[in-house]
């Protein structure tokens, strides 16, 4: 007996399909050929449904085009940290040698986790909370990542507002951070760089503490000199508030109609950075000292691989650079067609992310080499990470170029677009996660989106006060550090162990027609959870309180930071306790309903619980 499948349209001349008035979606004809002994072949045919989601009946929006989804994922994953953090870590940790642990962790943990989130969202077609129908007791993980994305929105939008402020300030014949003759400059400001002149007060980059660029950022934009600390914030600055309003308006109109609108916005925001990076690279490599900077970036010191800090930096960079754990990948992939090849998407997008991080290092260090030669200092004196790189050092380098205003406009447009699509992803995670969980919100998406963006705007106002940089630093340090690593760890355990890597692989095969290989199943089951556990433990053991330059945060501020961090992590045990207590029956029955997928409810009713068998936990 042999079986073959073909579409109804192609078989219309051979088989007349039965009509089903209420049938939804395309059908397939299954032909069964039976060869009898007399040589006569008889055929029978039946109509079968093609692969479809368990929730296919729901009227769920999908991406207008496949490229909309890919650009959205790439735009979210490739953010400002690709420009300001990876190149610095590579330089700091042995240059090209750093790529060894980075690529290793990317292959054994980063890609598998990325693939897992895409498949999880696409199969279940719900946001970060709704997907936990696969293990109801762990739905708190969904609320953890939603809350983290909301926290990040409170301060991430401020970075975009800074970039917008710089962009507006660049439309002049002379950039405002070139000289020390402005109203915001202090008597200590000096156009001439001095390698040891930067110890006079707080700053992102002590070496550049008294340059016009540093004073423009800290005194002209932030007005940090008018604050004595986090307990002396002062009023919001109207210029930054206006920029923040523009950012919020842009985010709202990009998100209010769902992926149909955001999928079009990313055509600009996700592609523009690559155009600008290419232009900056072509300009940077022609500058004097650029080769020295690139040589410093790529210099290989394999002895550094013997240091634990190098491996720790590589592990944390992999975790944060891909954007797993924010619920964004789950939200985006939930709008895919059910049969979309999420495996290929995972490979393509993670590869593009890593290549972007690596190539941006050539752009950054060509300019840093130029700055080092210009001021006759070692590259280590100008090689920094964080906001100081893109708002102090890079603007100062651009200011020395011919047509500096034009280059500044180009650079800050890149920062603006890098930030916008990442912020859109974070907001979409919150919106999709909650409207899928609460159907009342689903019917009023536009109003709920307005509520979310207004809430983030109001809380972001604390970050645009005179002392707002202290609030920004506190949130940046606590909101998405250990908490997001914890969330991803529980997520990996929930999918691979409680739901089962075998069942998860069956789901992927149902979608794509291809079962994940043993490599991916081993990574999900063993390697990725162990990797995440290692990173969580290391992040706790190596924790250092936040600081901004010479400013040390008071104890109450650090306590507030831990409240922020633990508030998101607490969603896991709080919801688990609520779910367990709300279920009827004995302890065993409660446990069965809590850890078994909702689709297995009938099996649980009959006492057939996969999770109560040893085979389930050992299966790979």
Curated annotation (Swiss-Prot):
Catalytic activity: dopamine(out) + chloride(out) + Na(+)(out) = dopamine(in) + chloride(in) + Na(+)(in); (R)-noradrenaline(out) + chloride(out) + Na(+)(out) = (R)-noradrenaline(in) + chloride(in) + Na(+)(in); dopamine(out) + chloride(out) + 2 Na(+)(out) = dopamine(in) + chloride(in) + 2 Na(+)(in)
Transmembrane segments: 57-95, 96-127, 128-171, 237-256, 257-287, 307-335, 336-376, 401-442, 443-466, 467-499, 517-542, 554-583
Residues holding Na(+) 2: 77, 79, 82, 321, 353
CDD domains the record matches: SLC6sbd_DAT1
Extracellular topology ranges: 172-236, 288-306, 377-400, 543-553
InterPro entries per UniProt: Na/ntran_symport, Na/ntran_symport_dopamine, SNS_sf
Cytoplasmic compartment spans: 1-56, 500-516, 584-620
UniProt: chloride binding residues: 317, 321, 357
The organism of origin for this protein: Macaca fascicularis (Crab-eating macaque)
GO MF entries: dopamine binding; dopamine:sodium symporter activity; metal ion binding; neurotransmitter transmembrane transporter activity
Membrane topology field: Multi-pass membrane protein
Record's protein name: Sodium-dependent dopamine transporter
Sugar-bearing residue positions: 181, 188, 205
Residue numbers binding Na(+) 1: 75, 78-79, 418, 421-422
């Amino acid at each position: 007996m042999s079986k073959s499948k073909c579409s109804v349209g192609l078989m219309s001349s051979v088989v007349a399909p039965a009509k089903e008035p209420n049938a939804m979606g395309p059908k397939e004809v299954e032909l069964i050929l039976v060869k009898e002994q007399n040589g006569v072949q008889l055929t029978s045919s039946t109509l079968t449904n093609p692969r479809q989601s368990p929730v296919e009946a729901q009227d769920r929006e999908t991406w207008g085009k496949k490229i909309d989804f890919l650009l959205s994922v790439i735009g979210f994953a490739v953010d400002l940290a690709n420009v300001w953090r990876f190149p610095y870590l590579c330089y700091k940790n042995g240059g090209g040698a750093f790529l060894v642990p980075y690529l290793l962790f990317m292959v054994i943990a980063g890609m598998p986790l990325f693939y897992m989130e895409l498949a999880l969202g696409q199969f279940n077609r719900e946001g970060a909370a709704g997907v936990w129908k696969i293990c109801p007791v762990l739905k708190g993980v969904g609320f953890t990542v939603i809350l983290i994305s909301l926290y990040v929105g409170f301060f991430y939008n401020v970075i975009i507002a800074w970039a917008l402020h710089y962009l507006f300030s660049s439309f002049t014949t002379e950039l405002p951070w070139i000289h020390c003759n402005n109203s915001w400059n202090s008597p200590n400001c000096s156009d001439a760089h001095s390698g040891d002149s930067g110890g006079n007060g707080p700053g992102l980059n002590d070496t550049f503490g008294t340059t016009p660029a540093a004073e423009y950022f800290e005194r002209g934009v932030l007005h940090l000199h008018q604050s004595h600390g986090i307990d002396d914030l002062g009023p919001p600055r109207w210029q930054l508030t206006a920029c923040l309003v523009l950012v919020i308006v842009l985010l709202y109109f990009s998100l209010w109609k769902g992926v149909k609108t955001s999928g079009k916005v990313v055509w600009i925001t996700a592609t523009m950075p690559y155009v600008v990076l290419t232009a900056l690279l072509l300009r940077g490599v022609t500058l004097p000292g650029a080769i020295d900077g690139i040589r410093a970036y790529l210099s290989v010191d394999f002895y550094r691989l013997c240091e634990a800090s190098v491996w720790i930096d590589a592990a944390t960079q992999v975790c944060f650079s891909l954007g797993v754990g924010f619920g964004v990948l789950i939200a985006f992939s939930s709008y895919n067609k059910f049969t979309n090849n999420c495996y290929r998407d995972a490979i393509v997008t993670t590869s593009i992310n890593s290549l972007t991080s690596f190539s941006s290092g050539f752009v950054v260090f060509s300019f840093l080499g130029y700055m080092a030669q210009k001021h006759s200092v070692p590259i280590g004196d100008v090689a920094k990470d964080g906001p100081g790189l893109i708002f102090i050092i890079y603007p100062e380098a651009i200011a020395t170029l011919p047509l500096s205003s034009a280059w500044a406009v180009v650079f800050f447009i890149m920062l603006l677009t890098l930030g916008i699509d990442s912020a859109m992803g974070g907001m979409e995670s919150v919106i999709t996660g909650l409207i899928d969980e609460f159907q009342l919100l689903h019917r009023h998406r536009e109003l709920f989106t307005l509520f979310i963006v207004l809430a983030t705007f109001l809380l972001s106002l604390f970050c645009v006060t005179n002392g707002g940089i202290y609030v920004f630093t506190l949130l940046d340090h606590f909101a998405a550090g250990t908490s997001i690593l914890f969330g991803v760890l529980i997520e990996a355990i929930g999918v691979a162990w409680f739901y089962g890597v075998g069942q998860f692989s069956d789901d992927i095969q149902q979608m794509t027609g291809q079962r994940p290989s043993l490599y991916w199943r081993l990574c999900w089951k063993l390697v990725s959870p162990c990797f995440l556990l290692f990173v969580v433990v290391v992040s706790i053991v190596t924790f250092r309180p936040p600081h901004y330059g010479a400013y040390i945060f008071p104890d109450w501020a650090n306590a507030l930071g831990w409240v922020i961090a633990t508030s998101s992590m607490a969603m896991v045990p709080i919801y688990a306790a609520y779910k367990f207590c709300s279920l009827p029956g004995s302890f065993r029955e409660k446990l069965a309903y809590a850890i078994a997928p909702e689709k297995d409810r009938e099996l649980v009713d009959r006492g057939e619980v996969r999770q109560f068998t040893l085979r389930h936990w050992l299966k790979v």
